Amino acid sequence: TAFNYDLRLNFDTSFTGKDLLRTRLRTGNFSSQPFGSSSSLFKLDKAESYANAVQLDRLYYSFPGLAKGVTLTAGALVRNTEMAWIPTAYKSDILDFFSVAGAPGVYNKATGAGFGAQWAQPGKKGFVANLNYVAQSGSDSTKGEFNAAGALNTLAQIGYRAPQYGIAFGYRNGTEGTRVRTFNGVAGNGGTLAANQTSNGYALNAYWQPKKSGIIPSVSAAYGWNYVSGPATPNAATNSQTWMAGVQWSDVFAKGNASGFAIGQPGNAPTLSKDALMWEAFYRYKVSDNISVTPAVFYVSNNQAFSGASSNYGGVIQTRFTF
């Protein structure tokens, strides 16, 4: 049993009422295993390994583009998934794999120096399109913003969303130093691409949710395919696929509460005799507008993070305060 915290302080400034300059400070005390490392299948969405040190976590500026519905973003510390649309109605905020809608090869939470453009068709429903670029080693003068060794991530997305449903196709290209999150049994340095390697990730996500809360839950599903190429690529770790399906009920027992269940397959190295399978279940109790308590349990089969393949259970009680 461990007691951990994650603290974020956002300093938001607007000059016109339509733009946003965000500076975020963050600290926490999660250890890398099992909850704090993006290489772990038990990685929690809200956990990072900061060892109690306060760090600058975000620094970016967003502003409207010239065309209607366009938002432009640039910054020294910006995340690719925050310049895109995560197409899912399943939002447990527990395991990292499900927080990126079962597509960690595309929505890999790459953070660094970058820029992006987002477009949403005006109205309650319509098309969306996003394109962004993040260099995770952009602050390193020996690599830079546009050097292939600088962990470059290019993410493109097109989709359609309406009040009750949505669907999107996403693509990400990664270079040396990038990685697919929550990968099981991958060859190489924890899944990080080596010199002369590139990755191409593809994802199709869709969801549907009822007009009103009741016994019928929202349904979310995803399929992802990832391909790694390059002269240094081990033959045993070129292709992988991921999928997930999740259901979530709203206003369970009381308004504002939620519960859900999700199951999925993380990326697995092709050499594994059995692929990993993971699931989670949660119930979120809304104490007030600013406080929630979420007990959750989860399970991973054939987890390669430990000595030999093993099946592991886990659980958390996540309390969140916002102000």
Stretches with model-predicted labels:
Residues K124-G126, A149, Y160-M278:
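Detector for outer-membrane/organellar transmembrane beta-barrel domains
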Residues S311-F323:
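Outer-membrane beta-barrel "beta-signal"
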Residues L44-A47, S99-A103, S141-G144, A187-L193, ...:
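Extracellular loop and loop/strand-boundary signature of outer-membrane beta-barrel proteins
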Residues D275-Y313:
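Internal helix-turn-beta structural module
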Residues A2-N4, S49-L56, V106-A110, N147-A151, ...:
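Transmembrane beta-barrel outer-membrane domains
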Residues A2-G138, G159-R161, A237, M244-N268:
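Outer membrane beta-barrel
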Residues L9, L59, F115, A156, ...:
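Membrane-embedded beta-strands of outer-membrane beta-barrel proteins
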